Regions:
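Conserved ABC ATPase "signature" region
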Residues: 95, 99, 105-122
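Conserved structural motif at the start of ABC-family nucleotide-binding domains
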Residues: 2, 17-19
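Hydrophobic anchor residue at the start of the ABC signature
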Residues: 140
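Conserved ABC transporter NBD signature motif
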Residues: 56-71, 199
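Helix-to-loop junction immediately C-terminal to a conserved catalytic motif
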Residues: 48
């Protein structure tokens, strides 16, 4: 479960978040929309502990964001421009991610994860030659590899073709059925959601 209360963030004189309150319950998919520049990505970065808020608080499974190790073990984040080590293969990138999260080998089935996102036949190719859509699929695999309880997806459909979009909708439905909390920033995705929130003027409604 993800909760945020009164989150604030400014960049210089511009206040992007003025007091954001939101809750995403376990087993719930929430769509977050808003104009470009409204602060959606900033909000997700704060919730993923990639940026610090200027004020307010947020918790993941009752752990405050300041408890970075616990929170990061529970969060899966996919940005709209996922980064990988281009000189490493898809499999090697996931193996590195598993090591960073100290995942036991018996809990990490990387081949099955790559197959699930349609990349098994490309798993030994360097990610530097992957298309944007393939990188997005690999990002989804990485996001789910450590079995997070909360998933934060920032424009995950943007680089995907029709098959990829269908796959992502299926994955999100599976995460929901697995009682995970899912917060998605997207436009016109056709995704089935439980609630839609709008970020405007620095607050969520």
């Amino acid at each position: 479960m993800l909760t945020a209360t009164g989150l604030q963030k400014s960049f210089g004189a511009r206040q992007v978040l003025r007091g954001v309150d939101l809750t995403v319950k376990d087993g719930e998919v929430v769509l977050l929309q808003g104009e470009n520049g409204a602060g959606k990505s900033t909000l997700l970065h704060i919730l993923a502990t990639l940026e610090r808020a200027d004020g307010g608080k947020a918790e993941v499974d009752a752990f405050p964001l300041s408890d970075g190790v616990e929170v990061r073990s529970r969060i899966g984040f996919t940005g709209h421009r996922p980064g990988f080590y281009g000189e490493l293969s898809g499999r090697e990138n996931l193996e590195l991610w598993a090591q960073l999260h100290q995942l036991p080998e018996h809990e990490t089935n990387i081949d099955a994860t790559l197959e699930r996102v349609g990349l098994k036949s490309f798993s030994n190719d360097h990610t530097g030659i992957y298309s944007r859509g393939m990188l997005q699929r690999l990002a989804l695999a990485r996001t789910a590899l450590h079995r997070p309880t909360t998933l934060l997806l920032d424009e995950p459909f943007a680089a995907l073709d029709g098959d990829g979009r269908e796959l992502l909708c299926t994955l999100i439905a599976e995460w929901r059925a697995d009682n995970r909390a899912v917060l998605v920033v997207a436009h016109g995705s056709g995704l089935t959601v439980d609630r839609t929130l709008v970020l405007a003027d620095g607050v969520v409604a």
